[in-house]
A protein has these predicted regions:
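Membrane-interface helix-loop junctions in multi-pass transport and translocation proteins
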Residues: 106-107, 114-167
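Small-residue hotspots at the loop-to-helix junctions and early N-terminal turns
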Residues: 1-2, 6, 76-81, 138
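Membrane-interfacial segments
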Residues: 23-26, 63-71, 131-135, 159-164
Length: 167
């Protein structure tokens, strides 16, 4: 969680400053600039996140042993790798969410997104119920994040004319 929080803080510093420009360009009915900013921020945040997450994922066992010594809990390395991979998709979700805020039509998007988030708990429970390894709890979170991405794409397509293939 600490690794995830540190990287997410860095990525937030990329995404958050773009929000006023995206909202202003949408309010000015400049959809071309809105999408250009959204795509650029999505690509930049995802690239930076991936550039930090990949070496951490590769060397996670060394990092954990250096940080925690010999008392690294079982499954920790896989939990971290899955969360890093999950948050790579989160870098794509956040800029789409900004566009939805700019439209002012949040009800549909929030309904889809909230339903997706609520899905993670029963999905994780089912994974554990059928005897899956603990890492599958984090796979449930990954599925939720991908579902949130699709919820954002569907919403922006419906309310802001985003082409599915453009994103």
């Amino acid at each position: 969680n600490q690794v995830n929080s540190a990287i997410n803080g860095f990525i937030a510093n990329i995404i958050i400053p773009s929000r006023p420009q995206v909202i202003q360009s949408y309010a000015n009915d400049d959809l071309q600039r809105t999408w250009r900013l959204t795509f650029s921020v999505s690509k930049l945040a995802t690239l930076f996140f991936f550039m930090m997450a990949l070496p951490i994922s590769i060397e996670i066992n060394y990092i954990l042993n250096f940080w925690l010594g010999e008392s690294v809990p079982e499954h920790t390395s896989w939990f971290i790798v899955i969360m890093l991979f999950t948050n790579t998709f989160g870098c794509l979700v956040s800029p789409i969410s900004t566009v939805m805020h700019a439209t002012g039509k949040m009800k549909f998007y929030q309904s889809l997104s909230s339903a997706s988030n609520l899905l993670s708990v029963p999905l994780a429970y089912v994974f554990l119920l059928i005897g899956a390894i603990p890492e599958f709890v984090f796979v449930a979170l990954f599925i939720t994040m991908v579902t949130n991405l699709f919820a954002g794409l569907i919403s922006t397509h419906k309310y802001a004319n985003l082409s599915y293939w453009a994103y």
